């Protein structure tokens, strides 16, 4: 029983570390995208936003992906793209 608990704690620690790495990667990408958008001319920025939103609209998610997850992704992309304009 102690071995099982120790193994589960070890796996949990691994997952937590992987989660931290993934969060750091996402935050780094968010910083890069925001900086790039802020340094673009307004018309270029809007064209890129329109292209990304258009591509996102055309994508048909796999049926196995819950609608809530798809909507969460779409909302986050919109937030990320609109943030530099504020």
UniProtKB/Swiss-Prot annotation:
GO BP: cellular response to starvation
Places the protein is found: Cytoplasm
InterPro entries in the record: SigmaS_Anti-adapt_IraP
Domain of life, source organism: Bacteria
Classification via Pfam families: Anti-adapt_IraP
GO cellular component term of the entry, any: cytoplasm
Residue stretches spanning the membrane: none
Coiled coil region boundaries: 1-36
Keywords: Coiled coil, Cytoplasm, Stress response
HAMAP family noted in UniProt: Anti_adapt_IraP
Family: Belongs to the IraP family.
NCBIfam families, per the entry: PRK10244.1 (NF007598)
Protein's job: Inhibits RpoS proteolysis by regulating RssB activity, thereby increasing the stability of the sigma stress factor RpoS especially during phosphate starvation, but also in stationary phase and during nitrogen starvation. Its effect on RpoS stability is due to its interaction with RssB, which probably blocks the interaction of RssB with RpoS, and the consequent delivery of the RssB-RpoS complex to the ClpXP protein degradation pathway.
Subunit structure comment from the entry: Interacts with RssB.
UniProt name for this protein: Anti-adapter protein IraP
């Amino acid at each position: 029983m102690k071995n099982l608990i120790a193994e589960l704690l070890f796996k949990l620690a691994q997952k937590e570390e992987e989660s931290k790495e993934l969060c750091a990667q996402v935050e780094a990408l968010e910083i890069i995208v925001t900086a790039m958008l802020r340094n673009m001319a307004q018309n270029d920025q809007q064209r890129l936003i329109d292209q990304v939103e258009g591509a996102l609209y055309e994508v048909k998610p796999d049926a196995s992906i819950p609608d809530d997850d798809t909507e969460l992704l779409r909302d986050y992309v919109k937030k990320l793209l609109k943030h530099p304009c504020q």
